[in-house]
């Protein structure tokens, strides 16, 4: 089951109730396309690991204080917490990586899960909350996007 967090006090209470279980916080927005893409997989994983994992959803538009506290700049962002400690962060909508991280931190450890790094950003599948809408700002902060599959790509400035 995925639990929608209402506010900071609610989040704090859910973290206490989780005790020694893994907590996965999904930072999302209703208007975020990548968030909608990964939501069904998150629901599936929450059901599959319900005995070991608590999945919480935090709407960034309704809970700015929590979003700032966890330094969330893009969506979807998944924060993995156990025993009150942040273990790992994953940004993007790659459902395979999300599943591997759940396996890794929920105690279902595989060699494949061991290859997962501490911070993951799937740049093809995020919404950047820090992006400026002004064209002049975008010109000053020229960001070049390259497909993760294009090994021969060259960035031009």
From Swiss-Prot:
Annotated S-S bridges: 32-35
Region entry Disordered, spans: 132-157
Biased composition regions of type Basic and acidic residues, renumbered to the chain: 147-157
Gene Ontology biological process terms in this record: protein folding
Keywords: Chromosome, Disulfide bond, Electron transport, Nucleus, Redox-active center, Transport
Pfam families: Thioredoxin
Keyword set includes rRNA-binding: no
Tissues with expression: Testis specific. Not expressed in the embryo. Becomes progressively more strongly expressed during larval and pupal development. In testis, it is strongly expressed in young spermatocytes, and postmeiotic spermatid stages, then expression decreases at the nuclear elongation stage. Strongly expressed in the waste bag, in which material no longer needed for the mature sperm is eliminated. Not expressed in the stem cells and spermatogonial cells.
Domain Thioredoxin: start-end pairs: 2-107
SUPFAM superfamilies, per database record: Thioredoxin-like
GO MF terms held by the record: protein-disulfide reductase activity
Primary location class: nucleus
One GO CC term, this protein: cytosol
Alphabetized InterPro entries for the sequence: Thioredoxin, Thioredoxin-like_sf, Thioredoxin_CS, Thioredoxin_domain
Places the protein is found: Nucleus; Chromosome
Main function: Probably participates in various redox reactions through the reversible oxidation of its active center dithiol to a disulfide and catalyzes dithiol-disulfide exchange reactions. Its tissue specificity suggests a regulatory role in the germline.
Family the UniProt entry places it in: Belongs to the thioredoxin family.
Note: The TrxT gene, which encodes an testis specific thioredoxin, is adjacent to the dhd gene and shares some regulatory region with it.
Protein name, per record: Thioredoxin-T
Organism in which the protein naturally occurs: Drosophila melanogaster (Fruit fly)
Gene: TrxT
